[in-house]
């Protein structure tokens, strides 16, 4: 995971990404690259719930992990909120974010984010 304090990059846009999927063994988009416009995503919170036990994470369009891997039990979940000055940053500009997992099964994921240079 890479942490980038946003002091040098003023917030320009923010939003919420939501995904409900039956299978994330193939990464599924939660926010698309079209919304990025030469900026990085800074993730400020994550809520992830899963039906099947497995390992899950958020990655960019190039399959580079943005979060660590969450090893979750069946019907498990995780909730995470970043301190204001240390959000998780996507590694490169112009990349969307996807949810990926090691097993098929219903998942729900919500992230909050802002975009900045």
Predicted regions and their residues:
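Extended, low-complexity, turn-rich repeat/linker tracts enriched in Gly/Pro/Ser/Thr and Asp/Glu
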Residues: 47-57, 101-108
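Short, surface-exposed beta-strand/strand-loop-strand elements in extracellular ectodomains
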Residues: 51-70, 111
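C-terminal interaction-tip segments
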Residues: 1-42, 92-94, 100-117
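Charged, amphipathic alpha-helical segments
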Residues: 42-43, 82
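A signal for specific C-terminal beta-sheet/loop modules enriched in small/flexible residues
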Residues: 23-24, 67-84, 112-117
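Beta-sandwich interaction modules
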Residues: 73-96, 100-103
């Amino acid at each position: 995971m890479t942490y980038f304090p946003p002091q040098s990059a003023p917030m320009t846009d923010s939003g919420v990404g939501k995904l409900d999927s039956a299978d994330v063994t193939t990464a599924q988009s939660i926010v698309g690259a079209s919304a990025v416009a030469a900026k990085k995503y800074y993730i400020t919170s994550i809520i992830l719930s899963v039906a099947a036990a497995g390992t899950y994470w958020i990655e960019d369009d190039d399959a580079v992990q943005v979060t660590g891997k969450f090893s979750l039990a069946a019907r498990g979940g995780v909730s995470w909120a970043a301190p204001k000055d240390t959000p998780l940053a996507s590694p490169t500009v112009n990349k969307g974010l996807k949810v990926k997992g090691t097993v098929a099964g219903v998942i729900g994921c919500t992230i909050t984010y802002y975009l900045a240079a």
